């Protein structure tokens, strides 16, 4: 968390988002010190909504006032909503926001994706590469509290983080963003 993480109008803004009526979350980032398949990621903003329709989520993201270079979201957002008859991705498109998704097995694999994202929290030298403005309170809380289910001896060990409905949405949005901006190469799903 750093106060000096600020919006730079000369740099593109990218978005990772996780759809959901009960909890929806979007993170807005800019890249610094970009290399071939890595960069410092500066999270400049967030949208965190509860009990909100997808159209309201899209409008809130638009209201931040950034011009978005790329938006990546949950592939499940391409499924048709039974009540509206259109997908979350189509709702965003109707608002002028094109959401990109990848459906390949490696990108969609949660275990591989979480492992990939860890590089930004701490690299092999112990240095962070994800820097977050303090106003992104819900993202910060989620990143600090994302966890795995408690293991009991009578259960199979779970390799996927706990879907708690509170902290997983921001973390999923970050995963969708980073696995698409910086694709996982030469890895197998799982």
Predicted regions, residues:
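Short beta-strand scaffold segments in enzyme catalytic cores
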Residues: 24-30, 175
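Metal-dependent nuclease catalytic cores in nucleic-acid-processing enzymes
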Residues: 171-183
